Structures are given as structure tokens and as C-alpha cells.
């Protein structure tokens, strides 16, 4: 055999299956600043050692396959393979452990969340040797972060565009979410905006259905925006949902929104997909549109504690892909959300640098290297009695969104909006005066009721409403 045709097999290639840990478990490895780091919650099948399971995750999410192949000899596995570099037990869980995996940056296409997730949370989640697998956190290195545009505008630019400072923004999702005609929908938008809200919102499943085509909705909502702006002297917006069946149609809807001169559009980033979302985010930056992101489908992925992907990972992915707002739970409303865990990923959305803090579920220090921040949106089962807690939990850089908590007011949409605005202004003023919202919240709301009949009526309607259910996805060590 000539040297030109010599194969790996002829110089010692050995076919067959070998244990993953022989190649992919490397506890001596020192991580690099350019590595993408992942923390997986691994539940191996009975009889599978933790080291083998962790190595299997590293292999199947990077360069490995189920058997040895001769083409391994045509590249440098040592350069490209993922490495399980540390394993630790999970408190209170005998069958689970956390496996830390480092991925070389060269494994990923620049500026592509789609490609990053295809590797890290791809086929490995169906691997038979694992009973369950969950991605708890990712460390995105600055070298990779810098390949993304990120949010179209970010928190400070949004405040400058809207001329709104020193308080959370107020929103409302129009209800019923499906079934209204475009004209009646626009009327509901107008009533909410003139009552004092900053934004109204399409529900996530409002796209372009037979009862209300998208173009008609956009036109009537634009009319509502301009009319309410003229009456109040404040800049208003409505999240026009541009989500569509194709990227081309999505961009067409965003173009029409820009032509109408409205300030913001919306996208369902998980059902629409990261490729579509990044495309829309780029269009929004180039054309001066803010981008509101809904997380429909997230609970399919993130709610179960032992399998899937934690929302903090989806939040980081959204900041890379692009969005100026994203729904982030409420802690106090009808939807799932542990307080410390929620505050952890809220910081990951807003702040430029976030230290590792396992008490809040943050496994890695994250440096965003000046990537614009994202406003967290608190939405789902909240009303005026929640306003002190929401203001205290989320702070000024947030959007507090009341759907039923606005439209369910006994006097109508505009009085419902007035009630929310009065409650918010009262809470912000009390906080600025040094009062403790966590302790005095109810008293602050009762005081405001004395000079706002709209707020008093809202407080009477919702005084007994509670959503007292335990959180499913708790941090480790919590009972």
C-alpha cells in the first residue's frame, strides 16, 4: 500500500465501542475563558456510573457518537471535543448529580443561537443511558457574546424613546384573547391607553385568524395609539404580534408596523424559533422598532425539575438572539415562578455583569460585555393588591402587565387602567419616601384608594383573589 492511500486502520485503528469516560471525562481540565460552559442535571439509568453519564453528555453534545469511527483520525478530537470536567451531587437527590461540561468555541457558528442549541440541547436529551437530563445554566464567554447583536435597543434607549423614567412601565394584554373583531379590539386598546397605561398587548396566539386579520388589527390599534397619545400627552404603544407561519410573512408585518409609525412589535420567540427571532431583532434595530418577546411554550421545556432546560438558559438565549422585553413570571401571580430563581434570571436579563450565586440558581459568573439589557415583564394573574410586591421585587426596570387586572374592572377598561396607574404611582412615591413596600404595601394601597374611586373599586373586586399553589421547580435544598 502506498503512503498516499494508507488508512487509519492500517496503522492501528481499532473498531468497536469504548466507554465515553475514557475520552470525555477529564477532571484535570482547566476551563478556558473562551469555552462555553454548561451545567447539566443528570439522572443516569440504573447501573450507569456518574462519570460515564457525564462523559456521555459531553460526547453526544459535541464530537462523539456511539462507536469508534476511523474518521476520528482526520481531525483533532482533543481540540474539538466537549469535556465533562466536574461532577457534584445534588442535595437530597440520590439519583441525580450536576455534570459540568466545557465546549470549545470553535464548535459553534458565530451569532447563531440556533446552532448553539442544536449541539448542546440536541439529540443528547434522548440518549438511552440517561433517565432524564436538564440544562441548568450556560456560561456564554465574551468572545462568543460579541458575535451577537443582542436586543434591538435595550433598556436605556427604550426609556429615551418613550420619555418614561423612574418607574416600571405598565401594560395590559387585551382580553378575550381570541374572538374580538379588529374594530372592537382597537377600542379596547384605546380605552386602556387613555386610562394611563404605557402599553397594551396582543396575546401570544393572536396572529391573523378569520375573525381578525393582522392588517386590520394593526390599523385599528395604530388609530388607538395616536388618539390616546393626543389626549394624554404621553407616548403609547401596542405590542403588535408579527409572529407568522414564515419568516417572510413575519418581516412583512413588521414592515407594515414601521410604516404606521408605531413604536413596538412582538414575537413569540420559542414557537417562532430562534432564527426567525434573530432576523426580526435585526430588522427592529435597523428600523427603530422596539421588540416585545413572549415565551409561549417555555413551560413545556423548563417546568419539570429533572428534564428539559431551565428558563435562565432560555433567558440568556433570548438576550443573545434579541428582544427588548421578555415575559419572566411574576412570583406572586397565577404562573410558576420561585422568587430567588426568578430574581436570578431577571438580573441575567438586565445587568451587564452577574456573579455566580447558587442561592439564586446562577451556576456561572456571566459577563455580557455591554450587550444591551432586556426588560423583564411580569404578567399573569396580577392585580392592584400585587402592585407593592411587584414594585419591590422587580424594581423600576420592568414592565408590569395586567390583563384581567385591568379589563376586569367593574367600571370598564379605562377605569381599570386608572386604578393600576394610581396604584403604581402611589407605590413608587412611597418607596422614594423611604417606606417599606414589603411591610406597608397594603396600607399604601388603602391610602391611595381614598382619593381614587377607580382604585377603591378595583381593590374591592380583587381583595380575596389568591393563587396559593406550591412552586414545582424549586431551587435545590428548598422544601
UniProtKB/Swiss-Prot annotation:
Coarse class of the protein's main subcellular location: plastid
Protein's UniProt name: Ribulose bisphosphate carboxylase large chain
InterPro entries assigned to the protein according to its UniProt record, in alphabetical order: RuBisCO, RuBisCo_large_chain_AS, RuBisCO_lsu_C, RuBisCO_lsu_C_sf, RuBisCO_lsu_fd_N, RuBisCO_lsu_N_sf, RuBisCO_lsuI
Modification type Phosphoserine: residues: 208
Active-site residues (renumbered): 175 (proton acceptor), 294 (proton acceptor)
PANTHER family associated with the record: RIBULOSE BISPHOSPHATE CARBOXYLASE, RIBULOSE BISPHOSPHATE CARBOXYLASE LARGE CHAIN
Subcellular location: Plastid, Chloroplast
Keywords assigned: Calvin cycle, Carbon dioxide fixation, Chloroplast, Disulfide bond, Lyase, Magnesium, Metal-binding, Monooxygenase, Oxidoreductase, Phosphoprotein, Photorespiration, Photosynthesis, Plastid
Quaternary context: Heterohexadecamer of 8 large chains and 8 small chains; disulfide-linked. The disulfide link is formed within the large subunit homodimers.
Record: residues binding Mg(2+): 201, 203-204
MF GO annotations: magnesium ion binding; monooxygenase activity; ribulose-bisphosphate carboxylase activity
HAMAP family given in the database record: RuBisCO_L_type1
Protein family (similarity comment): Belongs to the RuBisCO large chain family. Type I subfamily.
Species of the source: Arabis hirsuta
Marked site (Transition state stabilizer) residue numbers: 334
Extra information: The basic functional RuBisCO is composed of a large chain homodimer in a 'head-to-tail' conformation. In form I RuBisCO this homodimer is arranged in a barrel-like tetramer with the small subunits forming a tetrameric 'cap' on each end of the 'barrel'.
Catalyzed reaction equations: 2 (2R)-3-phosphoglycerate + 2 H(+) = D-ribulose 1,5-bisphosphate + CO2 + H2O; D-ribulose 1,5-bisphosphate + O2 = 2-phosphoglycolate + (2R)-3-phosphoglycerate + 2 H(+)
PROSITE patterns the UniProt entry points to: RUBISCO_LARGE (PS00157)
Coiled-coil blocks: none
Record's comment on post-translational modification: The disulfide bond which can form in the large chain dimeric partners within the hexadecamer appears to be associated with oxidative stress and protein turnover.
Residue list for modification N6-carboxylysine: 201
